[in-house]
């Protein structure tokens, strides 16, 4: 059992001078741009919560509707969620993956879908995998996508039911790992057990951020805690991340701790805990020369406290080091890195910004 690297955040002086960075607005008018992904230096796919997949030209600002996702539920936290380009895909007809909240006859769940972009049209849309994560709530869907060694990973929240976190008979509260065709890899940790074979890790509450750092070969996730207790986790094969037996947060209705303990044997401790919560969205590990001060650091979007959270990684320990864009007053929904090394982020007011040094 490892020691938790926790950071108590109560209006501490982490803010960077506003003169160091600025947000350059490159587009607006989207309906909650939940996921953004570059096709090349000039073009970006934008997932809007209402089910619209759009194409944005960064230079001109031109927006084009590519596709309207069928059977998408948009109530509450549901909607069209993440978008991710398959690495090393054919540039002429790139393959793209999506997650979304899918309506079914039994209720709403999370689905992983794929399509190809041909002649500025999204074609061949199909569900690769529909999760068994149906509840009657409209919250905690996750969901983010990452690719590692020709496998696709995607996260699913506990769907508003705490017991799902420790129940490996459901896909809710997990990170799943699949082959690109939706089949189960032979080396998945629960392939031969009674648990769902698609599960890579479990015990998650609502992981809305995930990023694979190619430089270190590490898969990171960030998830919402309850009242306090947001977490950054280093994702390991077959690991249990504790929810809801373990939590650093408190009940919404009172000052009582959530769960049985803050740490338990055989459950992974988070690498960083946010108290109070920042309500994290997506995250990246920045590698590049456009912002020398940020190289090798985690950048995470914050919804509740409306900023970009900068986290240093030193000898395996995580420490919050800075907060960027606090004066912008925007809920940061997604964050990504362009092919030429610039950080872009989307906000719930329908805008997309580029982070720039002054």
Locations of regions flagged by a protein language model:
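Repeated scaffold domains used in trafficking and secretory/extracellular systems
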Residues: 332-334
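Short, flexible active-site loop motifs that bind/organize anionic cofactors or intermediates
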Residues: 26, 197, 325
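Short, conserved clusters of charged catalytic residues that mark active-site
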Residues: 28-31, 202, 327
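Short, solvent-exposed aromatic-acidic interface loops
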Residues: 102, 130-133, 191-194, 249, ...
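Beta-propeller domain segments
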Residues: 78-80, 88-90, 158-322, 330, ...
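Acidic, Gly/Ser/Thr-rich repeat motifs that build Ca2+-stabilized beta-propeller blades
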Residues: 16-161, 212, 218-225, 276-314, ...
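Sec-dependent signal peptide recognition
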Residues: 1-8
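Hydrophobic h-region of N-terminal signal peptides that target proteins for export
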Residues: 9-17
């Amino acid at each position: 059992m490892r020691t938790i690297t926790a950071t108590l955040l109560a209006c501490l002086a982490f803010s960077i001078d506003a003169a160091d960075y600025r947000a350059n607005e490159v587009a607006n008018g989207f309906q909650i741009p939940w996921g953004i992904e570059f096709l090349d230096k000039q073009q970006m796919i934008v997932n809007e919560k209402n089910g619209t997949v759009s194409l944005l030209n960064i230079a001109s600002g031109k927006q084009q509707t590519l596709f309207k996702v069928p059977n998408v539920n948009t109530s509450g936290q549901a909607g069209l969620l993440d978008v991710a380009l398959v690495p090393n895909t054919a540039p002429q007809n790139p393959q793209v993956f999506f997650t979304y909240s899918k309506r079914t006859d039994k209720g709403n769940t999370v689905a992983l879908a794929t399509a190809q972009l041909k002649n500025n049209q999204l074609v061949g849309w199909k569900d690769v995998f529909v999760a068994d994560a149906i509840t009657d709530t409209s919250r905690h869907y996750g969901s983010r996508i990452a690719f590692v060694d020709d496998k696709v990973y995607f996260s699913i929240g506990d769907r508003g039911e705490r017991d799902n976190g420790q129940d490996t008979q459901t896909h809710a509260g997990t990170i799943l790992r699949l082959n690109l065709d939706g089949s189960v890899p032979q080396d998945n940790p629960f392939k031969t057990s009674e648990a769902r074979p698609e599960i890579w890790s479990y015990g998650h509450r609502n992981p809305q951020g995930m990023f694979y750092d190619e430089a270190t070969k590490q898969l990171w996730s960030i998830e919402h805690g309850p009242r306090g207790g947001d977490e950054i986790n280093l994702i390991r094969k077959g690991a249990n991340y504790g929810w809801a037996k373990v939590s650093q947060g408190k009940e919404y209705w009172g000052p009582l701790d959530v769960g049985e303990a803050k740490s338990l044997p055989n459950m992974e401790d988070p690498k960083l805990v946010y108290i109070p919560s920042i309500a994290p969205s997506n995250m990246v590990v920045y590698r590049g020369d456009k912002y020398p001060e940020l190289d090798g650091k985690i950048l995470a979007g914050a919804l509740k406290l409306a900023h970009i959270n900068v986290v240093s990684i030193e000898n395996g320990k995580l420490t919050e080091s800075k907060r960027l864009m606090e004066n912008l007053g925007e809920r940061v929904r997604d964050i990504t890195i362009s092919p030429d090394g610039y950080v872009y982020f989307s906000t719930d007011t329908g805008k997309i910004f580029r982070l720039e040094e002054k």
